Amino acid sequence: MERIPCLTTISNILKIINPEELEICLYGIFNNILKQKLKIKDKQICIDGKTVCSTANMKEHEKPMHIVTALLADASVSLGQITVDGKSNEIPAVRELIGLLNIKDSVITLDAMHCQKETVELIISKDGDYVIQLKGNQGTFYKDVYAMFDEKYMDIADKDSNYETYKTIEKGHGRIETRTCYVLKDLEYFTDYLAEWWGLKKIFAVKREVEIDTQKTTEISCYISSKNTSAEKLLMYTRKHWQIESFHWLLDVNLGEDDSKVISKNSQTCLNIIRKFCVSIIKKYIENNSVKRKTIIANMRKCLLNEQFLVDILTYYCHNPL
């Protein structure tokens, strides 16, 4: 190749590339190592959707394009994605993605939108476990669960006999953040729900208190899980689910995904795969090597200006993919 292809050529290529084949090519260099990693028990797979906001005003799209991604926690590696039109199609897309993945001995974490019996049954049928946030879309189930973790009720209840608890306190950037996980020890009150929700073994809540100067905010989130484990582990799963939110944020802030003007759905999907791959390899390199600047955008710019630095990142990731 004598020169870098023009934008039109790149655009035409992206329109005809098979996204699945592209993903295989990008991740194939360490596919065998990845397979070994996926055999480890209790690995966490975070699944969430992200809307490509720039597609909202494009005539070619009936609804804004929405990409559902499965992220291997701690490794920041995308295991797969499904592209749909609009967030309203996210629920069936998540089920389709779960159906494609090998989730045996994995813990699938999902937000409240996916607290659905059919989704839970699919996860259990594939020998996986789930940790899913519970919200008002489940009517009386949510109300009954939330009542057990209401502060007024907990103040008069015997916490030691009714709840298993675990607390973490983090200080930094002028704030103190306290997270407390309360796990119900006795689920006798929820017998009817246990029969309806496959594999349900734990009902718990996470109380998050943030103190900045003299201001304090409190937030309580309720969850259901098929994983029969400790309050410490359950709190860890809820915290690590934040990684996929952070991952999507990086795609916007560092790679400008929400500002992309690409019209083709196929091209947007391919670009999403490439962006996620770039974020994964640079993030991994920054975390494990001594670099002057720790931001992803700064290291991306360095890759453009220093070819050897780009080679160093790719070489490191080939040998240390996870």
Regions found by a protein language model. Name each.
Residues 33-109, 115-128:
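Polybasic low-complexity intrinsically disordered regions
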Residues 26-28, 42-44, 158-163, 248-254, ...:
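Short coil/turn segments at secondary-structure boundaries
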Residues 19, 99, 150, 154, ...:
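Generic secondary-structure signature for well-ordered alpha-helical cores
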Residues 1-58:
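Active-site- or DNA-interface-adjacent structural scaffold in DNA-acting proteins
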Residues 129-134:
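Short hydrophobic alpha-helical runs that function as membrane-insertion/retention elements
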Residues 251-322:
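A short, flexible helix-boundary coil/loop motif
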Residues 224, 228-262:
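Short amphipathic alpha-helical "interface-anchor" segments enriched in bulky aromatics
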Residues 135-239:
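An anionic, glycine-rich sequence signature occurring as long contiguous blocks
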